[in-house]
């Protein structure tokens, strides 16, 4: 998993509340267990017309936001089913950070396991960031995870809170496998000790 220390990129505004995982990645894209290639299905029902052509009115199809790295979204983002394909699709598109006033718990935790930083802010701060995101190609935000700070295009900053353990994992690029490998030495020592003390086991 890639480390997340600092991120600077265009932020796309998506001022919709209760965006569920079915909206993020429709069920038609759940047949694969590969994490790559799902970016094409991200928000597919809103992003494409019935004939499969891109919907020019959808934010991520607009030239200024086609390479967005940050999503500023409405309340209760990621609700619905627990499909891990949702953060996979966001990451494959290039989104490394989602900012909202709240997230569904399972989606929130899945983000950290896949290298995405979900940031919870107040409604007032979200309104300010949504205004920033509406600046098109000038909608550049900087996220500093070490300082726990968001800096807007005008230089103003917003602090955010994050669980210390989750922060550690993102800063060091540690998913569940990485966390286990961090303890490889201790695991090996334990196994050798157990084998020596219980040769019959």
Curated annotation (Swiss-Prot):
Single GO BP term: L-leucine biosynthetic process
Reaction(s) this enzyme catalyzes, per UniProt: (2R,3S)-3-isopropylmalate = (2S)-2-isopropylmalate
GO molecular function annotations of the record: 3-isopropylmalate dehydratase activity
Pathway connected to this protein: Amino-acid biosynthesis; L-leucine biosynthesis; L-leucine from 3-methyl-2-oxobutanoate: step 2/4
GO cellular component, as recorded: 3-isopropylmalate dehydratase complex
Keyword Lyase in record: yes
Pfam families, per the entry: Aconitase_C (PF00694)
EC class (word): lyase
Annotated disulfide bonds: none
Keyword Lyase: yes
UniProt keyword list: Amino-acid biosynthesis, Branched-chain amino acid biosynthesis, Leucine biosynthesis, Lyase
Enzyme Commission number(s): 4.2.1.33
Domain of life: Bacteria
Free-text function comment from the UniProt entry: Catalyzes the isomerization between 2-isopropylmalate and 3-isopropylmalate, via the formation of 2-isopropylmaleate.
Family annotation (NCBIfam families): leuD (TIGR00171), PRK01641.1 (NF002458)
Similarity-based family: Belongs to the LeuD family. LeuD type 1 subfamily.
Subunit structure: Heterodimer of LeuC and LeuD.
PANTHER family, A to Z: 3-ISOPROPYLMALATE DEHYDRATASE SMALL SUBUNIT, 3-ISOPROPYLMALATE DEHYDRATASE SMALL SUBUNIT 2-RELATED-RELATED
Name of this protein: 3-isopropylmalate dehydratase small subunit
Organism: Sinorhizobium fredii (strain NBRC 101917 / NGR234)
């Amino acid at each position: 998993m890639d480390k997340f220390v600092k991120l600077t990129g265009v932020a796309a505004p998506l001022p919709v509340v209760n965006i569920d995982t079915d909206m993020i990645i429709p069920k038609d894209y759940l047949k694969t267990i590969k994490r790559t290639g799902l970016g094409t299905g991200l928000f597919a029902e809103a992003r494409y017309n019935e004939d499969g052509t891109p919907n020019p009115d959808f934010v991520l199809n607009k030239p200024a936001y086609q390479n967005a790295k940050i999503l500023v979204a409405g309340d209760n983002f990621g609700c619905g089913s627990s499909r891990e394909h949702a953060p996979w699709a966001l990451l494959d598109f290039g989104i490394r950070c989602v900012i909202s006033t709240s997230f569904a718990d399972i989606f929130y935790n899945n983000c950290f396991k896949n290298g995405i930083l979900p940031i919870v802010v107040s409604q007032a701060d979200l309104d300010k960031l949504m205004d920033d995101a509406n600046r098109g190609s000038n909608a550049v935000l900087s996220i500093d995870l070490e300082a726990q700070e968001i800096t807007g295009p005008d230089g103003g900053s917003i602090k955010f809170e994050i669980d210390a353990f989750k922060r550690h994992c993102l800063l060091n690029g540690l998913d569940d496998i990485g966390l286990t490998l961090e303890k490889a030495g201790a695991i090996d020592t334990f196994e050798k000790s157990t084998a020596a003390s219980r040769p019959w086991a």
